A protein has these predicted regions:
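Sec-dependent signal peptide recognition
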Residues: 1-8
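C-terminal motif of bacterial Sec signal peptides marking the signal peptidase cleavage site
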Residues: 10-12
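Charge-biased low-complexity segments
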Residues: 14-241
Length: 241
């Protein structure tokens, strides 16, 4: 089977001491899409053929090149003193055969900072690409943001106990025009007194900005256990199918 390659943007915030040089994203030399294409190799007598198209890695890189600095600034300009903010983000594009981008979403994110994630989406929506090869395609680009501050991570059981049934408060953010997304990963940071410090979202479908704006306010008002002098990071699921 053919193995997909990835365009990787690595971003980090500077440490203490003298002002660090402004971080610059590093782009791999061989970016590609994460879309299956026709495969001539047989496995146990079966030939697998996928009718979807795929993106030329050079087309993806050319489309992203004008926006790498803006993606960096989404993180650095919104970080403030929250040096514990960091994580892995995967941006996902759906693109028509003529090169028109039809959807952009956060396929993955444990960054836990909706203002930064929203900024990344806004920049990603500005990117323009040449047409795919052999029809409609989709592709993903991972980004990594390195946290410098100290924090503790709560496991799934701890996270579930901490949040309990409070995520029902996010239901109020759904409207007739903006329905609630499904299978959403909610990442939270908890600080002194059990106060939520930051929250972010990712999902298998497009999460409307208006819903996420509302949900972020609701999530930041949740009552959570006190991590006692630490910043704790946790992730829970919302509306899983």
């Amino acid at each position: 089977m053919k193995t997909p390659l990835l365009l990787v943007l690595v971003m980090a915030c500077g440490g203490g001491g003298p002002p660090p040089a402004k971080p610059e994203p590093v782009i791999s030399a061989v970016p590609t899409t994460r879309v299956p294409v026709e495969d001539d190799e047989s496995e146990e007598g079966v030939t697998i053929i996928n009718a979807r198209g795929h993106m030329d890695p050079k087309v993806v890189e050319a489309g992203m090149a004008p926006h790498t600095q803006a993606l960096t600034e989404c993180y650095t300009m919104n970080l403030k003193k929250r040096r514990w903010l960091g994580g892995h983000v995967v941006l996902h594009w759906d693109i028509n055969k003529d090169g028109t981008v039809t959807a952009v979403r956060l396929a993955e994110s444990d960054l836990g900072a909706w203002p930064i994630e929203k900024c990344l989406l806004e920049v990603a929506r500005l990117a323009e690409f040449g047409p795919p090869i052999n029809g409609d395609a989709d592709f993903q680009i991972p980004l990594d943001f390195t946290a410098k501050g100290r924090l503790t991570s709560w496991d799934d059981d701890q996270a579930t106990r901490a949040v309990g049934g409070q995520l029902v408060k996010l239901d109020a953010c759904a409207t007739k025009k903006v329905p609630a997304p499904s299978d959403v990963t909610v990442t939270l940071y908890v600080g002194p007194g059990g106060k939520a410090q930051s929250v972010g979202f990712a999902g298998k479908t497009v999460i409307d900005d208006a819903w996420a704006d509302c949900a972020a306010k609701a999530a930041l008002a949740l009552r959570l256990p006190d991590p006692k002098g630490q910043i704790a990071k946790l992730a829970v699921k919302y509306r899983t199918e």
